[in-house]
Regions:
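Secreted peptidase-domain scaffold signal
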Residues: 125-134
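Short, hydrophobic-biased amphipathic alpha-helical segments
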Residues: 118-125
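Hydrolase catalytic cores
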Residues: 48-113, 119
Length: 134
């Protein structure tokens, strides 16, 4: 049950995301999980992936968590590149910011095989960035 991640999530630079149910904060049982046999800690973060509202109705799956994470990365890239805060931000730096801003449950140990370094929290990432810039 702990070796369900596959390519391309197994690469070092990829932001790998697992899925959880945002309604009750439970891990989605069909989500991929790590750690990897090559020693990499994956997933990096977890994002909502159960009953996500879309124009065609509610959808469940890792693709929903990936899409929400991609949207968060797009917001970060606007802040970094478009607004000239960090025009050289690369994939590893973006991943590090997402990890540092992740929301962690005090009853869990991080990183772990289901949640990675915690739940994706873009607000938390930007709050952390505002502290760094002061």
């Amino acid at each position: 049950p702990y070796t369900t991640l596959t390519d391309p999530s197994m690469t070092f630079r990829a932001v790998t995301v697992s899925s959880y149910n945002d309604a009750n904060n439970s891990f989605y049982e069909n989500s991929g999980r790590g750690f990897l046999s090559n020693g990499l800690i994956k997933p990096d973060v977890a994002a909502p992936g159960v009953n996500v509202s879309t124009p065609v109705g509610k959808v469940t799956g890792g693709s929903m968590a990936a899409a929400l994470t991609a949207g968060g990365v797009a917001q970060f890239m606007e802040w970094a590149v478009v607004r000239f805060n960090n025009t050289s931000a690369g994939s590893q730096e973006i991943k590090n910011y997402l990890i540092r801003g992740a929301n962690r449950n005090s009853s869990n140990t991080y990183p772990n095989r289901e949640w990675g370094y915690g739940r994706l929290d873009i607000d938390g990432t930007f709050a952390m960035l505002s502290q760094i810039q002061r």
